[in-house]
């Protein structure tokens, strides 16, 4: 199974790149984790936010593999504790499909992305900066993987 993070935004601060790449490199070869960055639409004073969201959504969905399971990252999604996320990761692996995780831009996700999703995952009821979400998702999934393989990274 491959994991794919599809995220709006292409110019992340160095600390985001460093943190994300650190976890990316830790993933085993049988579970590669890739990042696809979608350019954010220009948000000027008179920007048509609805149209920008639609365009970002189209680009995000176009980046997703044909049979991939789509999981959105969204506040109203399901909150998983770490052991629950590990169980979810195991279910995804057993399903045999690749998983695409979608992170929207400043206004969130397009309705088309939400409609295409089989699941929605909430990291927190708090509103989080989108760059930080990349690092949190990578760390959380790595920790979940470590639980499923009895790797010493996760400690109770």
Swiss-Prot record:
GO cellular component, one term: cytoplasm
Annotated compartments: Cytoplasm
Listed SUPFAM superfamilies: alpha/beta knot (SSF75217)
InterPro entries, per the entry: Alpha/beta_knot_MTases (IPR029028), RlmH-like (IPR003742), tRNA_m1G_MTases_N (IPR029026)
Pfam families: SPOUT_MTase
The UniProt record lists the keyword S-adenosyl-L-methionine: yes
Keywords on record: Cytoplasm, Methyltransferase, rRNA processing, S-adenosyl-L-methionine, Transferase
Recorded GO MF terms: rRNA (pseudouridine-N3-)-methyltransferase activity
Catalysed reaction equations from the record: pseudouridine(1915) in 23S rRNA + S-adenosyl-L-methionine = N(3)-methylpseudouridine(1915) in 23S rRNA + S-adenosyl-L-homocysteine + H(+)
Enzyme Commission number(s): 2.1.1.177
NCBIfam families cross-referenced by the UniProt entry: PRK00103.1-1, PRK00103.1-4, tRNA_RlmH_YbeA
Function: Specifically methylates the pseudouridine at position 1915 (m3Psi1915) in 23S rRNA.
HAMAP family reported in the protein's UniProt record: 23SrRNA_methyltr_H
Subunit structure: Homodimer.
Name this polypeptide is given: Ribosomal RNA large subunit methyltransferase H
Species, as recorded: Yersinia enterocolitica serotype O:8 / biotype 1B (strain NCTC 13174 / 8081)
Gene name as annotated: rlmH
